[in-house]
Amino acid sequence: MQHTGNCETLIVNSCFGSTCARSIPVFIDSCDLTAEVSRDEETRLARSMPVVLEKIESIIEKIFQTSGPNIVHDKDRAKIALCRLLLGPVAVPCFCEEWDTNDYLSKSGCKCIGPILYIHTSRCRCSDIPVFKFSIMKDYYASHVFRGLLSLKEWNTHLPNVLCTCELSMSDRYVATVYPKQNSIYLEYYPYFLCYLCRHLTVIEIEQCTNDLISLLGPKVAQRVIIHFKLLFGFRHKPHIGTVDSWFWENFFMLELHKLWLTVVKHNRVTTDFFNVVYEKIQNYKQYAIKTLRMSSKAVPAIQRLCLAKFKQQLLYLNIKVTVKKNKREMCLNGFVYGKTLYVVESSQLIFRNLLLLYYDYSLPDECKTNEENVLTAHYIRVISRLSFKRSRSALPPGVRPDFIFVAQQPKRKELPNVPGGIDFAEITSVRHGAVTLNAFNTNKVMNLKATISKRANFVYHRIPKTMTHSFVMYKHTFKEPAFTVSTFVSNDDLDMSSLNINIRGPYCDFLYALGVYKMHVSIRDLFLPAFVCNSNNSVDLQGLENQDVVRNRKKKVYWITNFPCMISNANKVNVGWFKAGTGIIPRVSGEDLQNVLLQELNNVREIPGLVFDMDLHQLLVLLEQRNLHQIPFLVKQFLIFLRLGLLMGYGHSRRNKVHDIMLHLISNGLFDFNKNSVANTKIKHGCALVGTRLANNVPKIIARQKKMKLDHMGRNANSLAVLRFIVKSGEQKNKTVFIKLLEYLAETSTAINTRNEVARLLQTLTAKVKT
C-alpha cells in the first residue's frame, strides 16, 4: 500500500497484467509430456459436475482475457478462445516439494512411466516473477499436475512462462496455457462455453474457424479437434433454470412465436387467424405442438386438410417462399405433402413449415422422433487416451502459413450507399476494363409481383371463359405521370389474387410511386414486394471511340433491323446488338448478370485490332454520363465535342492537358447538364405518353438539300468525324475554310489509320470544291 498525501491508495501489483494464465512447454518434439496424462485424469475430465453458471462464465472470461492486449475486438478474442477449446484440455505431470507449490499446481498422485517434470522454485534473472527450474525424469512419481488448454506457441507470446526461460529452448510448436486450479475445466462445461462464444460468433463462423484450424494443423490432429467441436454442441439435457423464473420456460415457444408475429409486414384477418390458431393449439395441446415445431427438415409429413385459397393468402402475407412439385416420393428437405402435391419451403423458413402443419391439424406419429447425435464422454476417453501428439504431428500442407494469429480488424473504407431496391433497379451500371469504362443505362424493365383484390363483387364468374385455365390479361393500364404500363393477369381458379406485369423506367423510388398511383385507380388491397425483374433492356455507348465503324465490322454476319444494320454479338448467352456510332443494346439481363455481360463484351471490343480511343474525351463523356445518370443527347454531345476541338486548336495540341482541365471544370459545374425527360430518342409507348404524341414525334431535324432530316440519324453517339463527314458530303457548308482546319487538326492528332484515310478523302473533296 502506498500513501499519497492525506489519502491512501491501494496498488496491487499483478505480474500477469489483465490475465491470470501462464504458458508452459509440453516438449512434443523431444519427450511429449502430454502423452503421460493418466486415465484417472481423463476420468476426472469426463465426470459429471454440478453446473454453476457464474463459475463457468468466470472461466470462459479468463480464457477470453488470455488472447492478449493486441487483440482488441471481441470477435477475434472469441476465435482464439474457440481454438484453445478445440485443442482441448491437457495436463502436464510434475513432481515438486510441498513448499514449492502455487495456485497453478493441483495434487495428483500417480505413477508415471513416461517423462515428467521435476521442478523447484528459483529466483532467476530471466524473469521478474517466480519461475521454476526444471529437469525431466522418467519412471517417477508425479505429485502434482498443471492443468489448462493446449495451444500454439504464437498464441502465448505475451504470457509469462512457468519454467525458467534461460534454460528453455522453445522450438516446439505446441504449449499449454495453464490456469489456477480453482478454474479447472470439465467436459460438462463445453456446451455452456458455446453459449458464451455465440454472443460474438455465429455458428457458421464457428464452423469456418474449426475448418481453418484443421487445415492448419493437419488431418492427424483433426480427430481431436472434431471431438471437442462435438462436445461444444453436446447438450444432452435441458439446462438448469437457476435463477430464471419457470414461467419463462413454460412460455418460451409463445414468446418466440410472438417474435415471428412482429416480423410480419402487414397484419390483417389472414395473419391474425393464422397465429391465433397456432397459439390456441400450443396452449391446449402442448406436447403435440412442441413435437410438431421440433420436426426435422428431413421428415416429409402428409396433411389431410388444406384450403388452397387461404393457403395462398398465408404464403403472401407471411412472405413464405414455396416451391410446388409432384410427389414422387423422393428424398426432399423442408417439405410436406397434400394429396399428390409436394410443397417445399426454403431452408431458412422451416419454422413456418412446421407452423403450417400445426395450423392444418397434422397428426404427429408417436414413432416420429428426431435422431440427434449424442456425444458420449466415454468415446472421448477412449479416443483421447490413444491420441498422442507425438504420433499426431503432421507437417504443414504446402502453401499454408505457419502462423495462426487473428489480426485485429482493419477499418473499412467508406463505401458508396447501396442502390435503393438493389442493383437490379440501378439506373446506371458501370464496368471498367483497363482505362476504358462502359456505362449501361436502363431503358425499361418489366417486373412481376403479386397483389390481392379488394372488391370481389366486381368480378362475375360468367365473364371469365370457363375453358381458360391459365392466367390471362384482364386489364391493361397506361399512365402518364409517372410513365408506366401495368398488365393485370387474373386466373379463373383464384379470384382473390392477381399477378401484375409492370413496364417502367427509372429508379426504385419511381417504381414505388407508380405502385401507389396504380393502387388509387384499381381495386387492389395489397401489393407484395419484392418484385421480380423478369426482363430488362439496357443501352450503352462506347465513348471517345475514334474509328466507330470497326465495332460492327469485326464479324461477317450482319442482321438488318428496320432501315439500318445491326451487328449481333454474343456474351454469356446474351445477344448484344451493336448499331452505328458505337451504340449497343443489351436485352433481358440486369444486376450482376448485366455486369458480367458488359465485362465480357468490353473485353471482346478491346481485342478488336486497330481500335483507338481518345482517352481524354472518353473520360469527359463518361463523367458527364455518371453525373446525369442518363445517356447524353446528340446536341449536348456535339456541343461538348466541338467546343473541346475548338479549344485544342486554339491552345495547340501541346497544351491539351490545360484544355482537359478546363473541360473538367465546366462539366463539374454543370455547364453540360441536360434534362433526363427528353423523349427525342425514345420509342416506348408510356414514355411518349408523358408529353403526348405530337411532342414525342418532335425530334430535332435539319434541312439538307431541301429535305428534312432527323438530327440523330447518324447515331446518338456520333463522333466529330461522323458529323464532319455528313456536312462535307451534304455540300451545305458555308465556310469551307473552318472545316478544312478542323479536318487537318484531326489528321495531325489521330492515331487511327482509318480515321486519317477518311480525313484525307474529305480534305480532298473540300479542297476541290474550294478551287472550283
From Swiss-Prot:
Q: What is the lineage of its organism?
A: Viruses, Duplodnaviria, Heunggongvirae, Peploviricota, Herviviricetes
What is stated as this protein's family in its record? Belongs to the herpesviridae UL87 family.
Return the protein name.
Protein U58
What Pfam families does this protein's entry cite? Answer: DUF587, Herpes_UL87
Any coiled-coil regions, as ranges: none
Q: Which organism is it from?
A: Human herpesvirus 6A (strain Uganda-1102) (HHV-6 variant A)
